[in-house]
Amino acid sequence: MKRRDIKSTSLLLMVLLVLIVTACGKNTDITTTTVKEEPKTESGDEMKGYDFSTFENVEITGIDMDSLTDEERSILYVQAKYCQAMTDADIDTMRELVSEDMIYTHMSGMQQTREEYFSDISDGSLRYYTIGIADPIIEVDQAKARITYTSVLNANAYGSRGTYRMKGTHHYEKSDGLWILVNR
């Protein structure tokens, strides 16, 4: 190899090294980077039979899952299951989770019965892609519960595609051992 080629190769390697180091950021120590393995305990996504990782289109943020009681966790799980069913347009699952007399109020103020709302999801008038459950606050009082959170909806609502952030509350009642979404 010629001396000129060696200098060019050395210069190129130095430039690449500088790019790699600076790409890691000012405060990153690349010599101590480790990979942390997820714990195999009942913490994180899978706790006491509640496997939140199965909800591919639902992201839950702003809550310490380890601090939840079993009842609070079950409410959050049902809410996530409902949101996943919305993104899958799984009307059968939604029917299982929602009372028959449910009335939906859209951010526009438009109100719909359960079946009208489900019909719009089924025919694609309402299409949910992902749903975030941000900063949920869960309150349980025996057979009644509510969850207040900010929805982060990536959706196409009647031809208007976008990401919509809305704060709201869902109310639940326990019926035959199952939590059902109800009107207030």
PLM region spans:
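Bacterial N-terminal signal peptides that target proteins for export
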Residues: K2-L11
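C-terminal motif of bacterial Sec signal peptides marking the signal peptidase cleavage site
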Residues: I20-A23
